Swiss-Prot record:
PANTHER family: PEROXISOME ASSEMBLY PROTEIN 26. It is a single-pass type II membrane protein. It comes from Macaca fascicularis. Residues 268-305 are peroxisomal matrix. GO terms for cellular component: peroxisomal membrane; peroxisome. Interacts (via its cytoplasmic domain) with PEX6; interaction is direct and is ATP-dependent. Interacts with PEX1; interaction is indirect and is mediated via interaction with PEX6. The keyword GTP-binding does not apply. GO terms for biological process: protein import into peroxisome matrix; protein import into peroxisome membrane; protein to membrane docking. Keywords: Membrane, Peroxisome, Protein transport, Signal-anchor, Transmembrane, Transmembrane helix, Transport. One of its GO terms (molecular function) is ATPase binding. This is Peroxisome assembly protein 26. Coiled coil: none annotated. Its main location: membrane. Belongs to the peroxin-26 family.
């Protein structure tokens, strides 16, 4: 029983001995309304799956932090609450397929990228790289990494490596990735060698793809040129066949007479002159050959019909 009495009295003892009736009772520190709203938002997100309500609750919590800041509240508590609100809000936006709004939604509360918490920035990188849009966070993460105040954080090295793997390498920014790894003291020697090896592998793959595309382009160009040269005789032959068929659609005697008159007008030779006989003979042979070719062509067309 004695031990029970001493045990029950232990919580009421202060630093200077047992609590006297004349001493005032110390009140618990006031709790920020944003903490209650954070718990409510997390409950809406995880339990009720009401993503819109969870996002709205996070926004009300942010307003509460801006309007009702408690002077006795530790600064670290406020930062943790803000980071947790961002995590819940990012998850709610992603669940509603509004992931494109995540970066702008976060920056409206932190104003500048350099002030983003490492955990929030890591979630943004993960989300946008998973949705194959890493370029959206390229400038934001670059600004955060270049800020001297962030380079002393313990999360800096892991976040820089995550940025290289998820953003710079997929975008082909190999020089920027190599400069970041070599110039940063946050990388250990082993991690630096591993990341540089990954950059070297990505550069080799990029060169192979570039050379392969050039080799594939050359046969296509050669094929197009040869196709043009092959199509030219076919075009000439089609024009010739069209002209011959049009010519022989007229009566043969009328065509012969028209050609003879044309020759007389152009060449201007005398049909009665002996010197004109070879020309007339060649002209007659030409028309016989044309007539024979046309008749054989018409015969082939009839067979096909």
């Amino acid at each position: 029983m004695k031990s029970d009495c001493s045990t029950s009295a232990a919580p009421f003892r202060g630093l200077g001995g047992p609590l006297r009736s004349s001493e005032p009772v110390r009140a618990a520190p006031a709790r920020s309304p944003a903490v209650d709203l954070l718990e409510e938002a997390a409950d809406l997100l995880v339990v009720h799956l009401d993503f819109r309500a969870a996002l709205e609750t996070c926004e009300r919590a942010w307003q509460s932090l801006a309007n009702h800041a408690l002077p006795e509240e530790p600064a670290g508590t406020s930062l943790e609450v803000k980071c947790s609100l961002c995590v819940v809000g990012i998850q709610a936006l992603a669940e509603m397929d509004r992931w494109q709004e995540v970066l702008s939604w976060v920056l409206q509360y932190y104003q500048v990228p350099e002030k983003l918490p490492p955990k929030v920035l890591e979630l943004c990188i993960l989300l946008y790289s998973k949705m194959q849009e890493p370029r959206a966070v390229l400038d934001v993460v670059g600004a955060w990494l270049q800020d001297p105040a962030n380079q002393d954080l313990p999360e800096y090295g892991a976040l820089a490596e995550f940025h290289v793997q998820r953003v710079l390498l997929p975008l082909g920014c190999l020089s920027e990735a190599e400069e970041l790894v070599v110039g940063s003291a946050a990388f250990g020697e082993e991690r630096r060698l591993d990341v540089l090896q990954a950059i070297h592998t990505a550069r080799q793959q990029q060169q192979q793809e570039h050379s392969g595309s050039e080799e594939a382009q050359k046969p296509n160009e050669e094929g197009s040129v040869s196709h043009k040269f092959l199509s030219l005789p076919m075009l000439v032959r089609q024009l010739w066949d069209s002209a011959v068929s049009h010519f022989f659609s007229l009566p043969f005697k009328k065509s012969l007479l028209a050609a003879l008159i044309l020759c007389l007008l152009v060449v201007r030779f005398d049909p009665a002159s002996p010197s004109s006989l070879p020309s007339l003979y060649k002209l007659a042979q030409l028309f016989r050959w044309i007539r024979k070719a046309a008749s054989s062509r018409l015969y082939q067309l009839r067979i096909r019909d």
